[in-house]
Amino acid sequence: MKPNIHPDNYRTVLFFDSSANEGWLIRSCAETHGKTMVWTDGKEYPLFSLDTSSASHPVYTGKQRNVNTEGRASKFNQRFQSVMSSFRKDK
């Protein structure tokens, strides 16, 4: 590897997916904002928290979550209809 081609903050970083309780040690320049975590080897590493990863994403795990499929427009129409019905009763 050529010397002096990597940034100064190129170091081993712990990427940790808290929803799956899994982590990976990877050399990276990712900004960790001073957060650290002790890993299974007993050493403390800079911590980059992940919202989702291959360990927790439904596409990779095969587990689907129940998601409310009702859209924003239909929710608005329901609220608007209740307002309009109360308005019509007043007249």
From Swiss-Prot:
GO MF term list: structural constituent of ribosome
Pfam families xref list: Ribosomal_L31
Keyword field: Ribonucleoprotein, Ribosomal protein
Cellular compartments per GO CC: ribonucleoprotein complex; ribosome
Matches recorded under HAMAP family: Ribosomal_bL31_2
Family assignment from sequence similarity: Belongs to the bacterial ribosomal protein bL31 family. Type B subfamily.
Protein name, entry field: Large ribosomal subunit protein bL31B
Lineage of the species this protein comes from: Bacteria, Pseudomonadati, Pseudomonadota, Betaproteobacteria, Neisseriales
